[in-house]
Structures are given as structure tokens and as C-alpha cells.
UniProtKB/Swiss-Prot annotation:
It comes from Geobacillus kaustophilus (strain HTA426). It is an enzyme of class 4 (lyase). A divalent metal cation binds at residues 9, 11, 43. This is 2-C-methyl-D-erythritol 2,4-cyclodiphosphate synthase. Homotrimer.
Length: 158
């Protein structure tokens, strides 16, 4: 049996926080605001995985009202989500992810993001695609107010 999941996340860019996307710390004058480390890409991947297995969303599993998740490492959150999928007998067929950001340029970090996500999902790098795009200066991402990410995963039950 195959299951598809889709995830989407947005975080505001603010001064005084590190910018972590796809498990990679990116040098930039702003970072993403959130209860956890606000890794918009790993949050989208986690939501996609939860959607594929019919287990709700990351807000249900890691509520921002719970102090245990304050400044949490999103890689650990995704690892927990993936453990739930594995317990249900799923493996990753592929993941396709898009980061929407006007700045900074993310191309130099894409391969490292792919490697991080592949490791967390116990997959080969070839099973994970990450791409980045802009909105041609339109909307909140185009104005540099925030960054968004989308992810789609295809899982297969063993």
C-alpha cells in the first residue's frame, strides 16, 4: 500500500535567531521565529509524513504550549515522527520539497539539506529532492518577512 502526505509551514524572519533550514545552519542576519528552532523545511516534511500515516500534524504532537518543545531541535522532532511511521511499517519511496524564500540564496546548502533529510528518514539521498524558489518579490516571502516550505512524501507499507 502506498500513502501520500503533504506538508506546509511558514515562519517569520526576525533578528537575533539562527537561520536553520533542512537541518542546516545558514549564515544570515535573520532567523526564523518559532517555539522550536523553527526549521520550516523539517516541519513541512514532518507534517507530510504525519499526513501520509493519518496521524494528524506537528501541532498535535509537539504543541507550542508545551515547554518541553521550547527551542527543540526540529531534526529530533522529525526523527520522532519517522519512528511513528516506521512503527506502522512504512518506508520512504521519495520526498519532494520546496523552500520559498527571497533571501538568502539557498543553492549552496541544498545538497546538505538532502543528506540531512535522507538520514532522518532512513533513505538514500536520491530519494529526497529539495529545491528553492522565490516569489519574484511578491507576498510576505518576497518582502523578506518570512520563509515557507512545502513537502510531499510517498510512503510504502512494507
Amino acid at each position: 500500500m502506498f500513502r501520500i502526505g503533504q506538508g506546509f509551514d511558514v515562519h517569520q524572519l526576525v533578528e537575533g535567531r539562527p537561520l536553520i533550514i533542512g537541518g542546516v545552519t545558514i549564515p544570515y542576519e535573520k532567523g526564523l521565529l518559532g517555539h522550536s528552532d523553527a526549521d520550516v523545511l523539517l516541519h513541512a516534511v514532518a507534517d507530510a509524513c504525519l499526513g501520509a500515516i493519518g496521524a494528524g500534524d506537528i501541532g498535535r504532537h509537539f504543541p507550542d504550549t508545551d515547554p518541553r518543545f521550547k527551542d527543540a531541535d526540529s531534526a529530533e522532532l522529525l526523527a520522532h515522527v519517522w519512528a511513528l511511521a516506521r512503527q506502522e511499517g512504512y518506508r520512504l519511496v521519495n520526498a519532494d520539497c520546496t523552500i520559498i524564500a527571497q533571501k538568502p540564496k539557498l543553492a549552496p546548502y541544498i545538497e546538505e539539506m538532502r543528506a540531512v533529510i535522507a538520514r532522518l528518514l532512513e533513505a538514500e539521498r536520491s530519494q529526497v529532492n529539495v529545491k528553492a524558489t522565490t516569489t519574484e518579490k511578491l507576498g510576505f516571502t518576497g518582502r523578506g518577512e518570512g520563509i515557507a516550505a512545502q513537502a510531499v512524501v510517498l510512503l510504502q507499507k512494507s
